[in-house]
């Protein structure tokens, strides 16, 4: 599933669905040497505009989010995603969650986003960037302007590149228990809901 497809929970608040399916080497395996033995030859990874990189290493056209660096490209060091500049639904974003092993970084290319890290909120504008460290609860959302774009980076990569891939369960509404279990399976804990429209608009 595309990470920017959103579900609406019973409270009426839209949340980003994080899809996951385990086809990638874990960070623990990388640390233990399982993923780098034998060591593969490193090579440049070029992803053209309008294309996304799949787990197989192939590329395919996309009109939505792009995976441009996968865990296997960087020996697990990082994963990079692009929300291409275009029209996206405002007031949508990630629920409150915490990564146990990944730092998350966002750079704003166009439009505005609002992020909350450790209870402190930031309005991010073009050219701004924000590090959301591991083990600190955070959430982010597109602000009121539909025209926006951003770059997301996770280090180490963990399973985050899989979270951006399409999934057969994209359109299946999950129970809160299923959502929490999904987050835990991939090294995160789901803590709460996304930023509300009022919270976004009050952040300056």
Q: Where are each of the predicted segments found?
A:
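N-terminal export signals
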Residues: 2-27
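C-terminal segment of N-terminal export signals and the immediately downstream linker at the start
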Residues: 20-58, 204
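A short glycine-rich, His/Asp/Glu-containing loop-to-beta-strand
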Residues: 58-96, 102
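Glycine- and acidic-residue-biased ligand/ion/polar-headgroup-sensing regions
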Residues: 101-113
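Short acidic-glycine-tyrosine-enriched beta hairpin
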Residues: 119-134
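Double-stranded beta-helix
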Residues: 139, 143-204
């Amino acid at each position: 599933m595309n990470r920017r497809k959103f579900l609406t929970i019973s409270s009426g608040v839209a949340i980003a669905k994080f899809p996951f399916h385990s086809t990638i080497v874990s960070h623990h395996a990388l640390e233990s040497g399982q993923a780098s033995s034998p060591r593969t030859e490193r090579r440049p990874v070029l992803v053209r505009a309008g294309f996304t990189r799949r787990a197989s290493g192939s590329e395919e056209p996309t009109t939505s989010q792009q995976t441009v660096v996968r865990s296997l490209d960087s020996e697990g060091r990082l994963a990079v995603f692009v929300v291409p500049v275009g029209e996206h639904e405002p007031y949508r974003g990630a629920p409150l969650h915490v990564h146990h092993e990944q730092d998350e970084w966002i750079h704003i290319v166009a439009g505005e986003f609002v992020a909350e890290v450790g209870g402190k909120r930031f309005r991010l504008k073009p050219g701004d960037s924000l590090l959301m460290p591991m083990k600190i609860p955070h959430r982010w959302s597109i602000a009121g302007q539909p025209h926006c774009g951003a770059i997301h980076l996770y280090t180490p990569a963990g399973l985050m590149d899989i979270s951006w891939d399409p999934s057969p369960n994209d359109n299946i509404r999950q129970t809160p228990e299923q959502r929490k279990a999904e987050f835990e399976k991939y090294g995160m804990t789901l803590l709460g809901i996304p930023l509300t429209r009022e919270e976004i608009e009050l952040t300056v």
